[in-house]
Amino acid sequence: MDLISACEQAMNPVGLDAVVARSLCDLKCHPIDGISMATRTLILLVCLLLVAWSHTDKKIVPGPSFCLGLGPLLSYLRFIWTGIGTASNYYNNKYGDIVRVWINGEETLILSRSSAVHHVLKNGNYTSRFGSIQGLSYLGMNERGIIFNNNVTLWKKIRTYFAKALTGPNLQQTVDVCVSSIQAHLDHLDSLGHVDVLNLLRCTVLDISNRLFLNVPLNEKELMLKIQKYFHTWQDVLIKPDIYFKFRWIHHRHKTATQELQDAIKRLVDQKRKNMEQADKLDNINFTAELIFAQNHGELSAENVTQCVLEMVIAAPDTLSLSLFFMLLLLKQNPHVEPQLLQEIDAVVGERQLQNQDLHKLQVMESFIYECLSFHPVVDFTMRRALSDDIIEGYRISKGTNIILNTGRMHRTEFFLKGNQFNLEHFENNVPRPPTFQPFGSGPRACIGKHMAMVMMKSILVTLLSQYSVCTHEGPILDCLPQTNNLSQQPVEHQQAETEHLHMRFLPRQGSSCQTLKDPNL
């Protein structure tokens, strides 16, 4: 779809300082006979211009040709048609680890070089994200919430509420809540022979989020359907052109999907407010309660409170549940890993319930989680926008330039010699430090819930794997599982044939976890 530029190779600046200096010295010390003063002055000016030219940035970023506007159109269509993640991988594979494309007519850089990614993540110049203003307004994210809020001042203010909820006392009670929730959902399974694992994980994670951050009764399955519709709308409208929103008959279903979830969350917030007003004593001030207090004091609008709760509720079911699903598939594709995990679980936890003090001892489990996040991440890129002019790796970046950080590709190509092979040894001795490994990002806009996410994943995996061996119906399927990669990597679920791949068998373990692996029926 792209036209290859004739000037595709980068142009490196030529150091002319020494050459010009010698020339000037020669002219001064050994004047050339017959050359007038005017000619000498002209030569001097030309030399000075050459020096100035040699110090300017002249690198041309590789990428598709502009070609009278056809290049920007074709690159934008690729992003719309194949998805942001898929298109980013395509351009990095074709042009290298720094590529220039266009999205909706705006110049966009795709970076998968670790030093460039690290520069952007750590720099306060890139605390803004890019996306369609009208699309974000549809989602309620335009200058609201935390995920795509580009009002940096308001975003920093709201971030403090999220930080408080995702650390401290809440983090301490997360293990108990996770173990209780996954156990309750396992106990209510209708059949162990045909388990919709992705739905199980989504409902479990939603229940955990509700207990920690909202704590009101809700219908998990009904709310999960609304969350899935909202997420699909999020993917569909994020980089759509403004003309797309001119035709109501085109985007009506998207408007309906977002409104349904927003109304549902608003009802839950209203219920929480009512419970607080009727309570004699508020023993547990959770995330939603803090936001309601902020609204009562005029610090946040009602719409912002609803959006913050919405984003907190959907964040984990959207990403963490899918990460766990991919981990279970990778576990079955790499059968040598399961005995290592079970041996550690038996040694650290035994037959009792997982506790907070056990988490740091689960080193094999931690290596497994990190390797899964590196090998097949749910979200393998990050979107940013330059707030002022900058230079990245010698390339001049103008204010307003869009940036896509292709961390998924970076993880596979920049640190490990065999990054395309699943191997726990990648993380056995020590976790690679930034800028090499960025599963949660870093810097001012890093994932604020990264510590809680690790606690939740460890708690759910330990509780599940200590009781069941999870088996796929048709063998290892992750590589051939139908997936899309737009805003995140998602298995295709809208077709019955693909949905069957999402079901697994849960085989109960008898006695020691390690002993059950020797059972030939497993």
From Swiss-Prot:
Membrane topology: Peripheral membrane protein
Localization terms from the record: Membrane
Broadest EC class assigned to this enzyme: oxidoreductase
Region forming the signal peptide: none
Gene Ontology CC: one annotated term: endoplasmic reticulum
Recorded GO MF terms: aromatase activity; heme binding; iron ion binding
Keyword Lipid metabolism: yes
Key words, A-Z: Heme, Iron, Lipid metabolism, Membrane, Metal-binding, Monooxygenase, Oxidoreductase
Gene3D superfamilies for this protein: Cytochrome P450
Source taxon at top rank: Eukaryota
Binding, heme: C447
Xref: CDD domains: CYP19A1
Iron found in the keyword field: yes
Catalytic activity: testosterone + 3 reduced [NADPH--hemoprotein reductase] + 3 O2 = 17beta-estradiol + formate + 3 oxidized [NADPH--hemoprotein reductase] + 4 H2O + 4 H(+); androst-4-ene-3,17-dione + 3 reduced [NADPH--hemoprotein reductase] + 3 O2 = estrone + formate + 3 oxidized [NADPH--hemoprotein reductase] + 4 H2O + 4 H(+)
GO biological process, one term: lipid metabolic process
Co-factor requirement: heme
Family note: Belongs to the cytochrome P450 family.
Alphabetical list of PANTHER family matching this protein: AROMATASE, CYTOCHROME P450 FAMILY 4
The protein's role, per its UniProt record: Catalyzes the formation of aromatic C18 estrogens from C19 androgens.
Protein name as it appears in the record: Aromatase
Organism of this sequence: Oreochromis niloticus
